[in-house]
Amino acid sequence: MQKRVRNRLITIIICFCSAFLGIGIILYNLENNIVFFLPPSKINAIEQDKELRVGGLVKTSSINKIAADKISFIITDNIKDLEILYQGILPALFREGQGIIAIGQLSDGKFMARQLLTKHDENYRPTR
């Protein structure tokens, strides 16, 4: 009887340890995705050359086309502004006043975006 209880206890302990280890691995892998984006006011100079997601509204009259596929614009969270440089195809919903999320790196006070995501409201409006 003593041996059965001990074996059952060892099995339960191994199951709990495995479950905690699995949860730990999942949380470690999700670490970069827990905070989807940071507003410009939360970006520090400390985060230079680190992969970031920055979100805000495209500031009015801030879009400058540098080349056919290169653009610069400013995003704001009404506290601080951040200049974004992007090379590539713009998303279809990109415009002034639109909420966007830029994925890239901060370098010399400018954000070098490698990908842009546009945000939209929850109302669906089919094209006419």
Swiss-Prot record:
Heme chaperone required for the biogenesis of c-type cytochromes. Transiently binds heme delivered by CcmC and transfers the heme to apo-cytochromes in a process facilitated by CcmF and CcmH. Residues 1-8 are cytoplasmic. GO terms for biological process: cytochrome complex assembly. This is Cytochrome c-type biogenesis protein CcmE. Belongs to the CcmE/CycJ family. GO terms for cellular component: plasma membrane. Its main location: membrane. The chain crosses the membrane at residues 9-29. Heme binds at residues 120, 124. InterPro entries: CcmE, CcmE-like_sf, NA-bd_OB-fold. GO terms for molecular function: heme binding; metal ion binding. The gene is ccmE. Residues 30-128 are periplasmic. It is a single-pass type II membrane protein. Keywords: Cell inner membrane, Cell membrane, Cytochrome c-type biogenesis, Heme, Iron, Membrane, Metal-binding, Signal-anchor, Transmembrane, Transmembrane helix. It is found in: Cell inner membrane.
